Amino acid sequence: MKRLLLITLLIGYIYPCVAQDKPIRTEESLEGTVIYKKTTTFEVDGYTYQCDVDDGSQFVTLYNKENKLKYEKIVYKDTGKTYIGSWSSNVIEYDRFMSQQADFIVDQAFTKAMADEIGKTELMITMLLSPNTGEVMEVNFNFFTFEPYAKVPLHVYREIEVKLKEQIHFKPIEEGKQLNYIMLAWMQKPQGKLPPLPPPGSLM
């Protein structure tokens, strides 16, 4: 009986310590149903987003309703002639730090739970830059209705847009300065971030 009592006391002492050292994490995951399945306007917390869905391909374009350039062609300001880019033509100076920072912003907007559910599927992010300052003027997102990104809460996309506008800027070169705007797009599989741990001694 004394031995059983000792074991019981030890378990009662050790368990709270283990629970405090390894708190249970609770973090946001993807929505259970598709959010962006048809052309819709979303009005949330003081901002408005437009979701355009191509009925045939189910290709989604998600962007701030205030955007003006999404469906505008890239043209030379002086002549109005359409700009045709190529892999060999540059319109901005390469900036490794800014490129990495843009990736980081996208990663941090997603929780680890979301990133795990998304798997290897990539999201397309497009930034439209000012040809004068190189600052981000608009941000667009693209994916398909049958991909996990169609279940990502709107505030995640909003966070990416806001932080890209606040933190990212590139230096346009002479060619870029002649355009009405500069487009930069990339595909990324978000890594997600771990949620903050609770204060020492507390349980979630």
Language-model segment annotations:
Residues L4-P16:
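Sec-dependent N-terminal signal peptides
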Residues Q20-M204:
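Charge-biased low-complexity segments
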Residues M1-L4, Q20:
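Positively charged n-region of N-terminal signal peptides that target proteins for export
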